[in-house]
Design a protein with these regions (language model features):
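Pro/Thr/Ser/Gly-rich low-complexity, intrinsically disordered linker/stalk tracts
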Residues: 21-43, 94-100
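Sequence contexts marking disulfide-bonded cysteines in secreted/extracellular proteins
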Residues: 12-14, 26-28, 38-40, 125, ...
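Extracellular low-complexity, O-glycosylation-prone stalks/linkers
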Residues: 46-58
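Short, flexible loop/turn segments at beta-strand junctions in immunoglobulin-like
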Residues: 68-73
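Short S/T/G- and acidic-enriched coil/turn segments that sit immediately N-terminal to beta-strands
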Residues: 63-67
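Histidine-/acidic-rich catalytic cores in large beta-rich domains
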Residues: 41, 76, 83-442
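Residue-level recognition of well-ordered beta-strand positions that form the cores
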Residues: 38-40, 50, 82
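Ser/Thr-rich, Pro/Gly/Ala-heavy low-complexity intrinsically disordered linkers and tails
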Residues: 1-24
Length: 442
């Protein structure tokens, strides 16, 4: 494993110049990004920067060297910096035009009162980029990434926003990177023994949790089963969890899913994990799509119970050894983005459930051994791959990538705002792929 801590270095590709960005005063445009400005302010303490622009008043906080980000393209902002309310500097910045990759990648909005800013990881015509858009659909931040693999495991295959509002990704199934809003690379690790896939997340403990896959033999058949790498803040793998250690009797049935066809030819994918979410308790929830099952696992390496499966939520006969929960209502199938919110409720994007695709909320009672659906946010049309559901200040944000759509639901379950995502006019699998849209703040 290798850890790189490269604060001034900005990663990227297909990002030629800064689109004509300009500035006055102590802030200067980044050479290779149209929407970011690096400031070196005349103070040695923390500052508040106020910007006046087309969307009104914005504020940014940081040390004397900070980056202004989250700005619309082709726009001028007057800025002023203050320490404890006393002005120390002022100037203006004018953002440039977006790079060529946005000639194909575009966003359209219907409705009003959308989320302030959301981040989307996209592969558009082979270009990996994380883009942040505001409630009007305007791009306000972007970060391209270099990728080379062309099979389903390649490109930008895992994504999450950390509690520190940084961007965490894994690329080409082989490396993990964390990028600050300034564009600086904070974390870069490669050299994994097994291929990464689908999802990764940063826990409150500062550790990074990443899904991987391994090849196993079950009764003479090559079988693909999932695991989790646990990395410490230095990028070292400090623990590994393997699903194979927690399986009962399993029927090896070829689902026809070809995600791993080029990596593990001839093998049968049994579990197909697609979500990992560490919780403050030291456990994590994991979605196993091909088992229509979500499980809770102790993944804190400092816990004597590390590796133990707690509850198991899925159909009768699910082969994972753990405490099976009883459905009081609801059920899901082919699910994605299983995670636990602060109130302890489980949220899942249900791709092919009985009531069609929907973001769903479940109350989990481990004492009673039950799961009860308490909310559902259905989307129109098919969602046969990926998908997510997030709780945002503006409402419940549900992503259905197949048609390239993100919907915002209000407290009454009505869609009040939608974002359409297209790549050269196309959506869904093919020219455009993206897994989720996640709230982010600047």
């Amino acid at each position: 494993m290798r850890l790189l801590l490269l604060v001034p270095f900005v990663v990227g590709c297909a990002n030629k110049g800064n689109g004509g960005a300009s500035a006055t005063g102590s802030c200067q445009p980044q050479a290779d990004n149209a929407l970011r400005f690096d400031c070196d302010l005349p103070t040695d303490t923390d500052v508040i920067v106020t910007l006046e622009g087309p969307e009104g008043t914005l504020t940014r906080a940081g040390g004397p060297t900070l980056t202004l980000a989250g700005l619309r393209p082709g726009s001028t902002y007057a800025w002023s910096a203050a320490v404890d309310g006393a002005p120390i500097d002022s100037g203006s910045v004018t953002t440039g035009q977006l790079p060529e990759l946005f000639d194909d990648l575009s966003f359209t909005v219907t409705g009003t009162d959308g989320p302030a800013t959301i981040a989307l990881p996209t592969m558009c015509n082979g270009q990996a980029v994380v883009t942040v858009v505001d409630a009007t659909g305007s791009v306000v931040w972007y970060q391209p990434f270099d990728t080379t693999a062309t099979d389903p495991t390649g490109g930008l295959s895992g994504f999450s926003i950390t509690a520190a509002q940084t961007v965490l990704v894994h690329l080409d199934g082989s490396r993990i990177e964390e990028v600050a809003q300034s564009g600086a690379t904070l974390f870069s690790v490669d050299g994994f023994e097994s291929p990464l896939h689908h999802d990764l997340a940063r826990g409150d403990d500062g550790r990074t949790y990443a899904l991987f896959a391994d090849l196993w033999d079950i009764d003479g058949q090559d079988v693909i089963l999932d695991g989790v790498y646990v990395l410490d803040p230095d990028g070292d793998v400090v623990a590994t969890w393997e699903l194979v250690d927690h399986l009962g009797a399993v029927d090896v049935v070829d689902s026809g899913d070809k995600f791993w066809a080029s990596t593990f030819p001839g093998a049968v994918d049994v579990s197909h994990a697609n979500a990992i979410d560490p919780t403050p308790s030291g456990s994590a929830v994991m979605s196993l799509m091909l088992q229509d099952t979500v499980i809770s696992v102790v993944l804190d390496p400092d816990d004597a119970a590390f590796g133990e499966v707690g509850w198991v939520l899925g159909p009768d006969g699910a082969p994972i050894v753990g405490d099976a929960l009883t459905w009081l209502s609801g059920a899901f199938a082919g699910q994605h983005h299983a995670h636990v919110e602060a109130d302890g409720d489980l949220w899942v994007f249900d791709n092919v459930g009985a009531d069609g695709p929907a973001g769903e909320r479940y109350a989990i009672d481990t004492d009673a051994g039950t799961a009860e659906q308490i909310a559902s946010y259905p989307v129109d049309g098919a969602c046969d791959h990926q998908g997510s559901v997030f709780v945002d200040d503006a409402g419940v944000l549900v992503t259905c990538p197949t048609p390239g759509r993100v919907d915002l639901f209000d407290a009454d379950g009505a869609v009040t705002w939608s974002l359409g995502v297209t790549c050269g006019g196309g959506a869904g699998s093919g020219s455009l792929t993206f897994a989720r849209a996640q709230p982010i703040t600047f």
